[in-house]
Structure formats: structure tokens, C-alpha cells
Amino acid sequence: MAIHTQESLSGFIASEPHLSFTEKGDARLFVKIGQEHYRREDDGSFTQTETTFHDLVAFRKTAERAHQRFAKGDKFVAEGYTHHYDRTDDTGQTVKAEEFIAKKIGHDLARTRYTVDRPRRTQATDSLDAGLEDAAL
């Protein structure tokens, strides 16, 4: 079976996370994110160039959990896809826009220090094969 891959995005949370709800009642998270860009120099060093800013949204449980756990300035890694759409600007003109739809999002391990708080394990949740002992093999 082939490896399932998705687009990924990394950067930092540039705005305070905003939680709202769709007409159907689903949670929707919106944040502005920043991405720092660098240029490799001939001597092997890197020079920071411009930082770009983009929109990131998430829905349902991912939105609720991200709103609880992320703050402005946090470094993140997300998996999802880029959504391209048309919107109307302040002058009434239709312009092309894009946003990253995060299906999964978490803190960037390479740039974040944190502690993991795991729930206490039980025998039933400790095994990947839980429940298979009752299955007819």
C-alpha cells in the first residue's frame, strides 16, 4: 500500500487565535500565521529575508483544541491543504485568495519546549491489539 501524504505548513502563530462557529454550528478557528524565509549565502551561512503572512483555518475538534492550546508567537506544524477562492476586497473588486485548511496541527518539536501530560494507561488502551483476543482468527 502506498504512503498517504498531505501538504504541510510550518511557521508561527502571528495573531491571537479566533474561534467562531459556522452556520451548522461547527467550530472554526482562524489565525494569521507567519513564515520566516532565508537565503543561503555562498559561505554556507543564511540571511533572513522577508517574513510572509497567511491565513490558516481549522474546523470542529481540531479548531477547539488548537484554540485552547495555541497562543500568539507559538511555533507550529500543520497538515492539510491549500484552499483557493475568490473574495471581494475593500474596493468591491474580486480578488484571488488562499488559506491553509489544517486537518491536524501541533507545536513544532524542533522549536518548542514543552511537557507531555499523558492519561494513565489501562490494559485495554495499552495494546494496539486490544479486542483482538475475542476475534475469530
Where are the model-predicted features located?
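Acidic, gly/ser/pro-rich intrinsically disordered tails
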Residues: 1-5, 18-25, 41-47, 64, ...
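OB-fold and OB-like beta-barrel modules that bind single-stranded nucleic acids
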Residues: 7-14, 33, 72-84, 102
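Short beta-strand/loop turn elements enriched in aromatics
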Residues: 30-48
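OB-fold/S1-family single-stranded nucleic acid-binding modules
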Residues: 83, 89-112
